[in-house]
């Protein structure tokens, strides 16, 4: 296996909010992709695929909500050091829970 270099992102941001908005835009793009897959499965009556995709629909809804919440928090705290410190602590305390997909 040959590991290749990961290219530097070609995006530049002029504010702290812009990367969060880009992240939310990407999450919305992923939602659209999942929805197209779901619609295709529905069109051919592939109910097992639809059942599997239900999990992705739910998870993606949570991802969009998280991205949106980050933007709201940035608007709320802005450049307030104490607020940003508290927000940073809150994000650090979040525990990863491995997703489970019913089979």
Outline where the language-model segments fall.
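Iron-associated oxidoreductase/ferritin-like identity signal
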Residues: 1-103
């Amino acid at each position: 296996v040959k590991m290749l270099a990961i290219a530097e992102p070609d995006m530049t941001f002029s504010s702290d909010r812009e990367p969060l908005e880009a992240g939310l835009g990407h999450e919305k793009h992923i939602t659209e992709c999942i929805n197209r897959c779901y619609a295709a499965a529905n069109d051919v009556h592939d109910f097992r695929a639809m059942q599997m995709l239900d999990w992705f629909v739910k998870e993606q809804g949570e991802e969009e909500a998280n991205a949106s919440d980050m933007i709201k928090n940035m608007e709320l705290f802005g450049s307030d050091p104490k607020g940003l410190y508290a927000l940073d602590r809150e994000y650090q305390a979040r525990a990863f829970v491995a997703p489970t997909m019913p089979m």
